[in-house]
């Protein structure tokens, strides 16, 4: 019988010693976690931990409110 396929869990890109800080002013970093339409990509796709995903979404929403990021992209 064949072994069932399983995916290796990716590590969080914001954990570790040299990990980048989540900041609402760092637009280039935040755009990496948004879809091409401007939506926040879920953590199961980006492998971000739950705590860091909350910080990330808060930073994206803050940057949107200030006007650094668009709400939607047409």
From Swiss-Prot:
PROSITE patterns: RIBOSOMAL_S18. InterPro entries: Ribosomal_bS18, Ribosomal_bS18_CS, Ribosomal_bS18_sf. Keywords: Ribonucleoprotein, Ribosomal protein, RNA-binding, rRNA-binding. Gene3D superfamilies: Ribosomal protein S18. GO terms for molecular function: small ribosomal subunit rRNA binding; structural constituent of ribosome. Transmembrane segments: none annotated. SUPFAM superfamilies: Ribosomal protein S18. One of its GO terms (cellular component) is cytosolic small ribosomal subunit. One of its GO terms (biological process) is translation. Binds as a heterodimer with protein bS6 to the central domain of the 16S rRNA, where it helps stabilize the platform of the 30S subunit. Belongs to the bacterial ribosomal protein bS18 family. Part of the 30S ribosomal subunit. Forms a tight heterodimer with protein bS6. HAMAP family: Ribosomal_bS18 (MF_00270). This is Small ribosomal subunit protein bS18. It comes from Novosphingobium aromaticivorans (strain ATCC 700278 / DSM 12444 / CCUG 56034 / CIP 105152 / NBRC 16084 / F199). The lineage of its organism: Bacteria, Pseudomonadati, Pseudomonadota, Alphaproteobacteria, Sphingomonadales. The gene is rpsR.
């Amino acid at each position: 019988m064949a072994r069932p396929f399983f995916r290796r869990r990716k590590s969080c890109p914001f954990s570790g010693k040299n990990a980048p800080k989540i900041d609402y002013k760092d637009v280039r970093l935040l755009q990496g976690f948004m879809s091409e339409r401007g939506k926040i990509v879920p953590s199961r796709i980006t492998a971000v931990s739950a705590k860091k995903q909350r910080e990330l979404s808060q930073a994206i929403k803050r940057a949107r409110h200030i006007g650094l990021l668009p709400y939607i992209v047409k």
